[in-house]
Amino acid sequence: MICSLVLVSSAGSIRAAEMPASKEYLNSIGMKLVRIEPGSFQMGQLETLGPNVLPVFRGRGLFDSLKNGDYDEKLIHTVKINNPFYMSEFEVTNFQYELFRPEHRALRGRNGFSSKDDEAVVFVNWYDATAFCRWLSDKDRLEYRLPTEAEWEYACRAATTTNFHTGDVLTQPFLKKITVGGLGINPADLTVGQTPANAWGLYDMHGNVEEWCYDWYGPYVKGIQADPVGYARSDFRVTRGGSVGSDMYYLRSANRLGAIPETRNWITGFRVVLGELPKSRPLKQPLRRYQQNVVTRSREQVTKGPDPDKPYFMGPLRYVNIRQGSVGPTYSSHNHCPAIVECPNGDLLTVWYTCHDEHGRELAQAASRLRPGRKQWEEASLFFWTPDRNNHSPALWYDDDNEKLYHFAAVSIARNRGKSVLAMRTSRDSGATWSPPRLIVPEFDGGRLPSEPVIRTNDGTIVVGVDGRHKGTELWASHDEGLTWYNPGAEIMGVHGGVVQISDGRLFVMTRNAAIDGKMPISLSSDGGKSFTSIASDFPPIGGGQRLALLKLRTGELFFASFTSEGGDGIFITDATGNRREIKGLFAALSLDDGRTWPYRRLVTDDGPARTIECTDGGCITMSARRSEYRGYLSVCQSLDGLIHLISSRNHYSFNRRWLMTKPPAPVDKPVRVRPIVETFDGPEKFDSPGWHEYKGPVGHFNGSGQYTIESGSHYNGINHIVRAGSFEATYELKNIHYNPSGSRPTEGVTVGFRDPLSTGHPTIFVFIKENALDSRTGVKVALSSPPKSATMKFVYNEKVPQWRIFYGLDGAEPTTELGQPFKVKNPTSEAIAAYVLMSNGSVDLDRFEIKPVH
């Protein structure tokens, strides 16, 4: 072993000691480092993953769609490491770090993590880690630093090509620190060196704590890379290795993670390398679709719009445009929780979350633009994603005073959204580029999910509402243009709060998941949010899958949009003929007196004949003068031309104040009755019956054998079709039912049935195929190792009773076996009822579907 020496030249200057050359090196603070020799390796996920490695899908089976790894690992490429370096055999410990910063001792044991000397240090951000490296470099006169991402994976693999340096799976004692579906929040022992070292003598490369790397995060590039150092700039620094409390999937050698550099938490630490930083040129980030061709337009161009004195309505226009079967960086499965803003150049910018599972680590934020004069939203592109962190709830705001766009986002510590921080960034070029994200609420805690609108109060304070820690809404405010933030103190009843300031200076908030006397609450504060008084509105409360929108218009009125209760009663309006009638679904309202009364109310529809549209994730709904979307998260903005732009979880509507204040016409048609449907699934390119819609983005295709194949790698992927009101018999014929290897875990499997969200008191009628029977219990999970090869199901609905009877036959049998007793329901179905065929983690061939009206 070569000792660290300080050599003094004849001129009296001090130069660094020479690099060691032995296999191991013990430095001045007792840290042992092992020598990593030059070489090359294949970087990225190399093997197909087995079911024992895949992450769990919220108790519903596994993510089979991730069997080839995350999308950011799939560009496998050769990396050459041309120079030797030393890497610490363990992660930096509390004892070692506190030689540099003794005050860190106060953080030991916080949240139940890392209290002992020999546990990995946590609650250190990227800047803390690099500062430690500089301190140690000055102390030893040697160059210590963080490893590059390529060096880290090269050293972790230690010449292996398997999922882990142990092989295709992790073995004991690694499994002691793995939590299936884990959140990374349960206290754990972080003592270093408790698991076996890899072939090169490095410990804890799979689990214990995540480790900061030198690189800015970015996409892999093609071709051979020599000593890569990542990107010149990004929003995130790379972390590697995974942590305690994680699924095995996130501990793989190839798995990439990242974090905002200022992040401090209980699952992230670091290890050091000794050696000169490679002199490779960092890469430049490619422009994403939403960043391209962003032009400047004059205010005169932007303010031109429809005649404000004539009613104007447009929609629905789909803004979620993602290709079928997409598994990253955008996902076709689940798209929800949007935000919308008009950019200074007149572009409309939408941002929403995109994922398989809203609790998953893959959940990212996507974006799309609608350029002035265009009739179609652009293809979605990745907008914001902290790698392998759930990035929930975007909020957008344009600050007219400072001509600046704001973007707020919740960033989880891992999966789920229960422990999050609140990040903010800004743009001065219509969202083409953004400032580095900054943690404005930096402590990981419950809630932190921002909602809209973001407002500036009369005294200049910026206010944003977030879901609080106790199932309520908190306000966070800034008096210094977003530099520092504080919570005024009160927690408001209900979540997803919309906040405005009314003319007398009070804050006015409306929320979800709360009710007063069976109505949505209004909460009012006259002290800047320190306390609130709540009263009942005259609108119905809303629940899961629904979010209201609230906005103070440029002309001073309050705009409100929400939904009638799913499966409940509607609200009443008076149309242009003087007829008072019930409407159900998405509606908008206008108040001229700060929310005391809402004299103008309209169903958000074009008032035309009944037609099928898609709502959240592609679920079918009948839009008419009586019905509109039944659920979704809403966001609203008003553009400079006066138009109000309202979006749900899938669609964009625009209308003006005059339309909202004009009484709707009488319906042009009567509720549509059920019609015959015969679908053979012969293809080869189109369905026999128009009106089938994808639900949650399956991979579906006509297979050339007279069938339509649905392939699913996640949960509830399939197709649906509007049936409409009336008595009918429905027959489903399914063949070649196949479950992916993870089908041995409980999952919904094949799900068939009907859903009518706009019929009061009418439940969803779904059945699930088990090995030798059907099951109709809500949310049933079946563990199928050998599903039936085929199934035929007949649903008989009688609207006069009203009731359902369900018959089935498996493996070629006729559908003569009745499933339990008839299902009696409260009310008849509506024109919005839809038939569903869904698959979770597997594939099924649809052979025939038929609807016969019964008179």
Regions found by a protein language model. Name each.
Residues 1-9:
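Bacterial N-terminal signal peptides
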Residues 14-16:
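Boundary at the C-terminal end of the N-terminal hydrophobic targeting segment
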Residues 25-107, 127, 207:
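A short glycine-rich, aromatic-capped structural motif
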Residues 42, 55-69, 106-253:
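Functional-site microenvironments in short loops/helix caps that host divalent-cation chemistry
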Residues 87, 93, 206, 273-276, ...:
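Extracellular, beta-strand-rich glycan-interacting domains
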Residues 265-280:
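Short, structured beta-strand segments at or near domain termini in extracellular proteins/domains
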Residues 284-673:
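Asp-box/BNR beta-propeller blade signature and adjacent active/binding-site loops
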Residues 669-855:
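Extracellular glycan-recognition regions
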